[in-house]
Structures are given as structure tokens and as C-alpha cells.
């Protein structure tokens, strides 16, 4: 072997591995290294394996070095045609495969199935929520109806009302109780308003409505609602015998002054108060009549025994069944008055 051949082989092919073998190794490691990195690593390996003797030959023969280096660089840059065909075919196959079967994301089928299952689960949940909402609305409507029914029952369970019609020029008539006005309302088809009163006693819930009749303006309609739970403050005053015990009974004494207080001619007592006074007067009359009627019967039954006794005659004259309270009071007391 000549020196020139040895130098070429030692310089251009420093190791037992050829350039093509290195190219196959580079193709195997293509996924980890790029083309420029392979080029730099090839040059670095060439310079690392060059011996000092070949380096001296390279410096002494610059002309012979330039041509093989150009060939080497071109051979490294240009890959063999077989590898280019393989890579092109692989790329075409990959592209065709990607077009036919697009790349599936990891767990795409599981995600799609999970999403469908989630939708299927959400549907019954929404239906359950709608059913619960409907049940809540039904319960609310039922409770509202019950409350309305209770309110209606409470309204229906109001106390009885009693109305009195009195001819008077004064709207608010005295009836023995104290009232406080708490409202006034216009009446339909009537020019006269309706006044509302409440009893001033705290424990009493009696109400009174006063309005003037539009058919007969001289008539006042007084409506009472409820019953008083206390005695009238006017009846608690001392009773005057002169005003209560008159010649024509309690009904005639109402205009002269009943229960110890004077009543003007323009002021009228309500029928409710009049009925109360008449009821008590009738009870007292019945008790007195039963008492003195028994005395009269006793005298009549024993008249034959006593004969024409003057004392019996006098007693008969004194005891007269007039049906009035004058029978109790002696005649001389009445004359003195």
C-alpha cells in the first residue's frame, strides 16, 4: 500500500465504522436528535479520532484535503436515495392513515361514553327536581287554601249583630256606654257616611256602627256587634227613687231622668238600653205582686172569721191591687210628697 492511500484511508475513514453505517445509526436515533445535531456530532467524532500523524499530513497537503472534505460534506448532507424513498413512503402512509382515521384523543371513547352516561343521569335528576318543585308548589297552594278557609271560618264566626232604628236628629245616641270613634266610611248609594265605634273598656270587644238611612234621613240605624263584658259606667251611679219610681213605671221615667242622671229632650236612649230597664222593672213588679197578692188572699180568706172588723176594712182599703209600685208605699207618704 502506498503512503497516499494509507493517508486517505486513515484520514477519511479513521475507524472501522463507515459514514453510511453512521448514517444508519443516525436514522435510528432520529427521534432524539435533529439533523444539525447529527452533523455536529459527526464532525466532532472525525476530529476526535484523527491521529497526530494524520493531522500533520493534513497540514502538509492542503490541496488533497479540500476535495475529499467537500465530498464528505456533500455525502453527509445528501442522504442516500433509498432512505429518502423510505421516509417519503412512511410519511405518505402516515398522512393517509391520519386522513382516513383521525387521531383519537386518549380515552376519547371512555369520555364520550361517560358524557352520555352523565347526560342520561342528569335527565332523571332534572325530572326529579321538577317533580319535587311541583310537589312543593302543590303543598304551598294547599296550605294557602287552608289558611284562606280558616280566615273565612273566622270571619263567619263573628258575633251576632243587632240593629236598632231610631228617629233622631243626633247620629250618636247615648246608650249608657262609652265609645271611641275609630273610622268612617262612605256608603254606596247614600249621601250619609257610616261611623265606626269601639267600646273604651280594654277587655270589651263590642263594636258599634252608626249610619243614617238614605231612604228616611230622620232615621238613625245603630248596629251593635258583640256583648259587653262589664257593667255600664252610668248604671254604677247611685239610683234616684224619684226618677225611677214614677206613676207610670220605668218606661215613663226615661224622659225625666233615669238612674240618677238627667236626660235632655233631644237625647234619646237606645232601644237596647230601654229593654234592659224594662226587663228589670218587670221582674221587680212580679216579685212585689206575688208578695202582696198572698197577703190579700189571706185577708179575703179570713174575712168571714173576723166579720166586719174595722181593722180588716182598713187593710182592704190600703192593699189595692193596681199592679204598680204605689201599692207598697203608704197613702200618707204619697200625700206628703
From Swiss-Prot:
DNA-binding region per UniProt: 168-233
Origin superkingdom: Eukaryota
Ranges of compositional bias, category Basic residues: 142-155
Gene Ontology terms, MF aspect: DNA-binding transcription factor activity; transcription cis-regulatory region binding
Region Disordered: start-end pairs: 100-160
Gene3D superfamilies: WRKY domain (2.20.25.80)
SUPFAM superfamilies: WRKY DNA-binding domain
Keywords: DNA-binding, Nucleus, Transcription, Transcription regulation
BP-aspect Gene Ontology terms: protein localization involved in auxin polar transport; response to auxin; response to nematode
Matches recorded under InterPro entries: TF_WRKY_IIc (IPR017396), WRKY_dom (IPR003657), WRKY_dom_sf (IPR036576), WRKY_plant (IPR044810)
A single GO cellular-component term on record: nucleus
Disulfide bond positions: none
Record family assignment: Belongs to the WRKY group II-c family.
Task of the protein: Transcription factor. Interacts specifically with the W box (5'-(T)TGAC[CT]-3'), a frequently occurring elicitor-responsive cis-acting element.
Record protein name field: WRKY transcription factor 23
Biological source species: Arabidopsis thaliana (Mouse-ear cress)
Gene name per UniProt: WRKY23
